[in-house]
Amino acid sequence: MISALSFFLRIFNLATPKGLVFDEVYYVDGARDFLKYGVEMNNNAPEFVVHPPVGKWLIAAGIKLFGNHEFGWRIAAAIAGSLTIYLAARIAMRIFMDSRWTTLTALLMALDGLNLVMSRTALLDIFLTLFILLAVNSWLAGRYLNFAVFLGLAMGSKWSALYFVILLLLLELVLNRNLIRVIKIGVTSGAIYIFSWIGWFTSNNGWDRKVKSNPISSLIYYHKEMLGFHTGLTEKHSYQANPWSWLVMGRPTSFYYQSPAGCGAKTCSQEVLAIGTPILWWIGAIALIFLIGVNLHNFAMRELDFAVLIPLVGVVAGYLPWFFFQKRTVFTFYAIVFEPFLILAIVLLAKFAYEYDAKFKYLIGLAVVLIALNFLYFYPIFTGQIISYNAWSARMWWSSWI
């Protein structure tokens, strides 16, 4: 029910704002090229692109089904974002085994502004998040073939999935001590990743397609170029944000800003700000500290609790690696991939508090109400509604949000 209602929020007025928003200019263009050429082109010449094709193929599917317009560009992201809410709840049920905490997980996912914004924008990160959650859910269910396939699709969306692949396979090896299974999963996920480049293999127009004597060698050469781009990306951007600031939403990314007429005031504002619901994320920062402490205690006691371990694994894989790229240009919205696991950490904190003293249910309820009100307050700048400049300015709590 929560996922269904969230889907409505994601598709309602999905064509707003008009035109290409932020990096949609790259990914929608790439999706159009896939439909026309099978690969990405620039003025009828091969185009150097730095992300794998899966997410762009999903955007292309939306365009094919619904048309080459804003709704068609964004519908795949809206579906993916709605599914992340459902999948986070499924994972919560597997690790908490209690419908109350499952419901709370789904509700908090639905009340996160970052998830809403990313679900209404044709970028790749929401697809990465979807496949990571599908992989984790499959792993917890013991469906190892699905686990491998979804890991491959995650890597085929964005390379940052590799951190999840490494950590999850190491965890599988440590917990089950089955090296053969881990190798099979790794090989299968790698094969799925390579297969995701099928458009490049079957076309003579792909970038570096014929730079070497055979397609595999050419793809390896191309990947070296992609790696060079990613490791050398240090160009300054007005909305780049150090990972230290992500949890508190210190520098959210403005995807769109205009000053149109139509709000009834002298000056109007229309913005799409990729920011998490502030109160939710601030509680998440506290919950992460708690989560680390509980895991350290369990490690010292040699205890294993998936309800404690899974949220930490997700946050570590999705968040920690970015601290090692202090000179690289990065953005707060990259946090969407570990957002479900941060919410699981919040739910874990609520669960511990309630089990310690049932009276904490009143505090938990109050926190949910405050998060919901915070979400509603920021809703206009999550969805690009036209509001007065004063109303917009009132929502810029920190100067770094402008």
Task: Tell me what each language-model feature is.
Residues 16-37, 185, 189-249, 387-396:
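Aromatic-rich transmembrane-lumenal/periplasmic boundary elements in polytopic membrane proteins
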Residues 170, 180-185, 189-194, 198-208, ...:
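Transmembrane helical bundles and short interhelical boundary loops of multi-pass, membrane-embedded
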Residues 9-15, 25-57, 61-64, 224:
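Extracytosolic helix-loop segments that constitute the early lumenal/periplasmic catalytic or substrate-binding loops
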Residues 4, 71, 75-96, 134, ...:
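Transmembrane-helix motifs of polytopic, lipid-linked glycan transferases
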Residues 2, 79, 88-111, 144-146:
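Transmembrane-helix signature of polytopic, membrane-embedded enzymes
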Residues 20-21, 77, 114-125:
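Short acidic/glycine- and proline-prone juxtamembrane loop motifs at membrane-interface regions
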Residues 2-6, 105-110, 137, 151, ...:
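Short helix- or helix-capping micro-motifs
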Residues 87, 108, 127-146, 150-151, ...:
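Specific aromatic-rich, kink-prone transmembrane helix
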